[in-house]
Design a protein with these regions (language model features):
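Generic hydrophobic, amphipathic alpha-helix propensity
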Residues: 347, 372-375, 379
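Glycine-rich flexible loops
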Residues: 1-338
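Short, well-ordered alpha-helices that flank and scaffold nucleotide-derived cofactor binding pockets
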Residues: 45, 79, 353, 357, ...
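Canonical Rossmann dinucleotide-binding motif of NAD(H)/NADP(H)-dependent dehydrogenases/reductases
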Residues: 331-363
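Conserved glycine-rich Rossmann-like NAD(P)H-binding loop of the short-chain dehydrogenase/reductase
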Residues: 358-375
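Rossmann-fold cofactor-recognition segment
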Residues: 379-388
């Protein structure tokens, strides 16, 4: 299949076709959407996904069991479409949603309708306590959370950047705090994410740090957490290497970075690390999606993570490996953070531009606050808010 796809391109397009190309190609409609909305994935990732799909949508949507994307799944989508020409979409177990239409607008409106119907149903049915209730009721103030994150982030970054420099991102949103403060944090985190589009960014499971936000002496508790950091990081690396060795096949690519991407800190929030700021932020956003899915799935049924072998076969799929190898080579300062004093002046901004062009993130400092704000806006517009 992979060898044939380049022969189907137009205008000598040398970009490799998506792994999902057959899934779109065999659906017999002019316009096809493939989506991963939290509300629908929450239904797709329950133990009784098929029954819930039928309960919510009746005969409007079809359903297919989990299968890795590819040619065979494309044929199954086509078969279901032809056997049931009245359906307006298909839920893929543990994966996502397909919808379609004869025109782009009708396809778009169909997608919105399906997502809204799932969200409305969940809002009506999910009236229980999320994540087994709260173990801690926001025990730390915003300034205390920031202080803990500020202490942990550079330490973790240094310890996991021995092979490749990494940049961090922190999220303390309400949905994240509800998860990291929950009674069921550790068992749910251990289940891993289900949607493959999530765990390809986040790894299959996060690292939950050993930290008690209700300790009488916060400084002493933070010192204890820091003291045990090496052991926790090494335990995750060992667990990931064991996962690789259990699941690898004869032609599997070599093991990749064994460090966690997502770090959950009780009472504090979520920290993510990746090769650059944008990738770290996106990984964080994807794990927020996973949190939303777990909350809604467990509220109406029981959340089911993807089978470990299936997850490995996606993560180390040769087609995914080929995609990684096609990515642009890192710039010379990727993963570096530069602090520039006098950053609002001509020399400071020129220095910032030079470093940004080489892949660094920059922090600007200047005694002229107004000029510094203007410089930040200018550079953010040219390079993105992620890196300035």
């Amino acid at each position: 299949m992979v060898g044939y796809l380049p022969h189907c391109t137009f205008n000598l397009n040398n970009r490799a076709a998506s792994i999902d190309t057959p899934l779109h190609a065999y659906i017999p409609y002019d316009h096809v959407d493939h989506l991963h909305p939290d509300a629908v994935i929450a239904i797709a990732c329950t133990k009784d996904s098929r029954a819930l799909t039928e309960e919510i949508f009746g005969g409007e949507l079809g359903w297919l069991p989990w299968q890795r994307p590819g040619y065979d799944l494309g044929l199954k989508l086509e078969t279901l479409c032809r056997e049931r020409p009245d359906i307006e979409g298909i839920v893929l177990e543990g994966h996502g949603l397909f919808t379609w239409g004869d025109k782009s607008k009708s396809c778009y409106l169909n997608s919105l309708d399906v997502i809204q119907k799932a969200a409305d149903w969940l809002a009506q049915k999910n009236t229980g306590v999320a994540f087994g209730g709260s173990a801690y009721d926001n025990p730390l103030s915003a300034s205390e959370r920031d202080a803990v994150a500020t202490r942990l982030m550079p330490l973790i970054r240094g310890k996991i950047s021995t092979v490749q420099r990494k940049v961090g991102h922190c999220n303390q949103s309400d949905e994240v705090l509800a998860f990291v403060n929950a009674n069921d944090l550790r068992p749910l985190a251990a289940l891993g994410t289900s949607c493959p589009d999530h765990f390809l960014r986040t790894k299959i499971r996060p690292l939950v740090l050993d930290f008690n936000p209700t300790a009488d002496d916060l400084e002493a508790e933070l010192a204890r957490c820091v003291e045990g950091l090496d052991q926790q990081l090494e335990a995750y690396r060992t667990d990931y290497a064991d996962y690789y060795n259990r699941c690898k096949r004869d032609n599997s690519p070599a093991i990749r970075d064994t460090n966690a991407v997502v770090y959950l800190v009780p009472g504090v929030g979520m920290i993510t690390f990746a090769k650059d700021k944008a990738t770290a932020r996106i990984a964080c956003e994807f794990y927020v999606n996973a949190i939303n899915v777990m909350r809604e799935a467990n509220g109406v049924s029981e959340y089911v993570g993807l089978d470990e072998q299936e997850a490995f076969d996606i993560e180390y799929w040769l087609l995914e490996e080929a995609k990684l190898r096609r990515m642009p080579k890192p710039k010379s300062l990727d993963g570096q953070v530069a602090f520039i004093t006098g950053g609002a002046g001509g020399i400071g901004k020129a220095t910032a531009r030079r470093l940004l062009n080489e892949g660094a993130c920059v922090i600007l400092a200047d005694i002229d606050t107004e000029a510094m704000v203007s410089a930040k806006q200018e550079l953010s517009a040219d390079y993105s808010q992620d890196v300035v």
